[in-house]
From Swiss-Prot:
Domain of life (superkingdom): Bacteria
CDD domains: CysRS_core
Keyword annotations of the record: Aminoacyl-tRNA synthetase, ATP-binding, Cytoplasm, Ligase, Metal-binding, Nucleotide-binding, Protein biosynthesis, Zinc
Zinc found in the keyword field: yes
InterPro entries assigned: Cys-tRNA-ligase, Cys-tRNA/MSH_ligase, CysS_C, Rossmann-like_a/b/a_fold, tRNA-synt_1_cat_dom, tRNAsynth_Ia_anticodon-bd
Motif annotated as 'HIGH' region, chain positions: 31-41
Protein name (Swiss-Prot/TrEMBL): Cysteine--tRNA ligase
Annotated residues for binding of ATP: K285
Amino acid sequence: MDLRLYDTLTRRKRAFTPIDPSNVRMYVCGPTVYDFAHIGNARPVIVFDVLFRLLRHLYGDDHVTYARNITDVDDKINDRAARDFPDLPLNEAIRKVTEKTAAQFQADVAALGCLPPTHQPRATEFVLPRTDGKTDMVTFIKQLIARGHAYEAGGEVLFDVRSMPDYGALSGRRLDEQKAGARVAVDAHKRNPADFVLWKLSSENEPGWDSPWGRGRPGWHIECSAMSTAYLGDVFDIHGGGLDLIFPHHENEIAQSRCAHGTHAMANYWMHNGFLQVEGEKMSKSLGNFVTINELLTTEKFGGRKWPGEVLRLNMLRTHYRQPIDWTIKALEESETILRRVCGRIKQFEYARRGMPTKERSVQLNLPPEILEALVDDLNTPLMLSRIGELSYDDAFDHALLSIGIDVLSYARWLRSQEQYASSNVDELVVARLEARMRKDFKESDRIRDELAAMGVVLKDGKDADGKPVTTWEIAR
């Protein structure tokens, strides 16, 4: 079956023809690591993980290269570091913020069932020329200047948008329609209001690198152009991200890459997922409906309970990736009901009910034609999920859900463990351990802790609002 994908640039669904079938290449914009990822950030991660899995199924695991960057240099990071660690030197504070946030991001997306990309380059590793010869940002900018597409002014290096005749093709914005101050920075040094920063100077207190234009740091857009070139080449197959990145980020990536390399394209297919709102409203901290992936997984902030990663992932995929999605408690409950029903229909669930341990599975997926037909039609996961109930043999349920990253057997085992622990004396043991700790009987406390650990119970000690010791628990996944 032929894969067809909706291409934002041509505004139509196109048959996918890779440049090199032995090395299909995809780049997706990753997180800026200044804060924990929210549920809206999870959507492109899940969507393009499904595409990564599908490409591997169609072309082979060893014939797909997927790069997703980590932006660890940004003014938001600087501000967060100064706020959270005011007593530390800024560079040290930045390192603490980015390392903690990046580690949490990796844990979150793993809990959502996402495969690690082939490459996850960090922006700070690609600012200056590298010993391995991979493309870096300073060299990229010098190339743009040499080709007449960038200029130095007011201590900055700026991209000259007039040097690219079809600038704005991705977003459909003509240069004469773009007003200064409307999503383009006002700068008296610019030749055109839409010109954007490639390099800016850093103050003594700001992070920076020595360059031909003075000590400074890269602009946002140049990072992705350099890192995608480093791992995927001048022109590659697919570039993905959220709708909010079409302008200015992806538009400017295209301009930089095409002008630096003298190519007809940066990527042959541009894919974008739709927006996410929460309970019918735009997600924002001021409305109190802002929720991170970690909060959904580990706290009772949303709906008064924790949500398994499989439920979050299924809920995301019940809506087509290009359509807007309303993230609601009701929808999550419906997704959980669907998963429970599927578990009940798989004969292997009987093994899970007997408590067999979860094992890493390497499964050669045998996808029924009707399932694959839906997936190759622009990742039509809603259609694919609607067809699961029509399948007539048990393995098909398992393989169909595995193809979109949901390990239903693992989820089934977890369900069974939850049922077992609900009827056990875990709560009593947790209370007994806490009491032993409070009376400083650490030998007894450690004994109970080890007993619970052997049962797969993970303990978390803390304090309540009044400062009193409390212990919560959960089942290890």
